[in-house]
């Protein structure tokens, strides 16, 4: 109980910080400081080590580099939950698993409905399938202890499965031309990490060094570099012996150490460099285009319809039960909150459209609007339900 309470408090603070940096990015992009903001995003950063040369603008270092650390953390969370947490049994995983599948299928179908026949636009079909766990849990934590713990666990489990789905989508659908040499180096790195895991090697620095080699090789391979973070996480031992012979969990220690860095530095920085939408160039006509409508309605309508609809079916068919001490309206309110795509949707958007501004920021504004509508509506639904409980 204390662990979950502490986690939710931290996510609440992180969510508030994400809002602040998003507003700051919007102000900078739409003021006399827009040139300085754009220049900051495209600041060249180079790394040379012998024959190795990596040169990218700051924006891509954040998206390819820092977000790999974020996905490393997600990988650690998934591993812990599957091995000993809320996803460790079929009974625990059934409802959030089915809900997560619905929350990916329905938004994707809505986007496809608006954009079928447009090959480039269709690259963005996965944008509305994502959920931003920091924001969604942040909204729940603002409602206090009156929201049943079972619903918070449901949302946490659903979000983790949702993130796992995003990882699979990135691996399958957002991979470019492959480099055989780089993939070979990545495979060798993974093999070494696997052997270290099986031999119970308990040296963090060894995993980090091999992990960096893995990241560089994946970056050069054509597979998105963030997947290196997930692969590395799955190779970190859940339990090892230290030099004194005592058992400890390297995976849990790394997860704990990274949480604050991810919540208060990496995700806010990602939001800052990606949420700077140029509102001056966006018209009502642009926002009524198939891509913005597919994204916005996919997030606000598709996510809640998919999560709640699939949950309702699973419960009515006897495959799962309603979370303890909750109601259908509470479950619906949480389902609406899953439409907060924000950072995850922005990330998929950057992959889908390769950071081009072909839609003149309308796609990104649609993400912000869909996420805001989901956050506000979900909060109000749960708030009214809370008041009803107070009165009773």
Swiss-Prot record:
The keyword Cell inner membrane applies. GO terms for molecular function: sodium:proton antiporter activity. It comes from Sulfurovum sp. (strain NBC37-1). NCBIfam families: NhaA (TIGR00773), PRK09560.1 (NF007111), PRK09561.1 (NF007112). It catalyses: Na(+)(in) + 2 H(+)(out) = Na(+)(out) + 2 H(+)(in). It is found in: Cell inner membrane. It comes from the Bacteria. This is Na(+)/H(+) antiporter NhaA. Na(+)/H(+) antiporter that extrudes sodium in exchange for external protons. GO terms for cellular component: plasma membrane. It is a multi-pass membrane protein. The keyword Transmembrane applies. InterPro entries: Na/H_antiporter_dom_sf (IPR023171), NhaA (IPR004670). The lineage of its organism: Bacteria, Pseudomonadati, Campylobacterota, Epsilonproteobacteria, Campylobacterales. Belongs to the NhaA Na(+)/H(+) (TC 2.A.33) antiporter family.
